[in-house]
Structure formats: C-alpha cells, structure tokens
Amino acid sequence: TLSRGLGDVYKRQMSIGRTFKESMQKALRSLETGRHGFGWDGKDPAGPSREDIERKLHVPNCERIYWIKVAFEHGWSVEDLFEATQIDRWFLVHLKEIADEGANLADLDLRRAKKLGFSDKQIALARGESEDSVREKRKGVGILPTYRLVDTCAAEFEAYTPYYYSTYGDENEARNSDKKKIIILGGGPNRIGPVSYTHLRAHETESN
C-alpha cells in the first residue's frame, strides 16, 4: 500500500527537465497515482470551500501539492500559500505560473504547453479531444521530444558515461552511434535510478 504521510521517513521522486515546472509535472506523473501532472486531469475536487482548502493545506502529505493548485484557482496568492504551508516562496511562484498557464490550457500554444510539462492527456482533456488526436497534431507540426545531456563530470572533462533526459527544447544532444544497443527495463517502485539498483541491473545484463 502507498503510505501517504511524510514524517521523517526518507521518500523521494526524481525527474529531470529544462525547468522546475516541467520537472514537477513529470515527477507527479511518474508517481503512478492516476494523476497526469499538476491537475487538469479530471480529478481535481469540485467546488471545495475555503475551509476545505485550508484543512487540506495544513497537513503535509502526498495530496497537498494538488490542493495548492486548487487554492491558486480559488484566488489564493503566493503569500497566502506561504502562510498556510511554509513552503518556500520560490516553489510557490513557479507552481502559480503552472496554474496560471493551465487555466488557459485549452487555448495554450502546443509547444508552450509541452515546455511547461503538460502531458498530451492533460491537453486532450482541456480541449475535449482524444490523447491520440493531440499527439498526432503535435507530431504534425514537428513538436517532438529532444534529448539533453546530463553532464556527470560538471564540464571538467569529457563524460564517457553521460545520461539524457527528454524535453521539448530546440536542441537535441543525443549522440548517434552504430554500436549495439541494449535497453534495461527496471520494474517495481525503484526501477532504474538509484545507483545501487542500476549497478546491479547493468552487471546482471553483462553476465547474461
């Protein structure tokens, strides 16, 4: 079962994007809670009162992030949210920017929407279209994922084991190669990412 409290237990979610806004929406999707980002997925609460919002914001848990979006939609300011949650204003400012842009998601430029981390599913629901329709329109105008390099050596010397993340920028840093390629699929809650698990899966693959 999914523990919904935070407390002092170490929990994390990792995602990489060009901006915090893109990374945040990617992280929320990867939680596998049925949400497709920072809302706009048909699962936001309908007609909550101010008391409902205050109560949900008061206790840190895995649902509070979505209530921050609801609060912005109901006219709360960054300062209101800071007073209610004590979350650093830097994060709240960026979350508000997502909320402000998402309010016009149905009419938002597709490239802009993708750079903000909105999924095809979110865009489809906002526009009353199918996810496949949005994807085909996006591909038809050349809005495709690009891949950016994560420099594991901080530019001190060439990285021979870099990794990449997908985004919707203009520059693609993926290196083309004719070498034989292997895809390692990680299942379960840890998948691929934590160094120890990745290391074990890589050696397991080499031994087969």
Predicted features and spans:
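Feature marking long nucleic-acid-engaging regions of large polymerase/nuclease enzymes
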Residues: 11-15
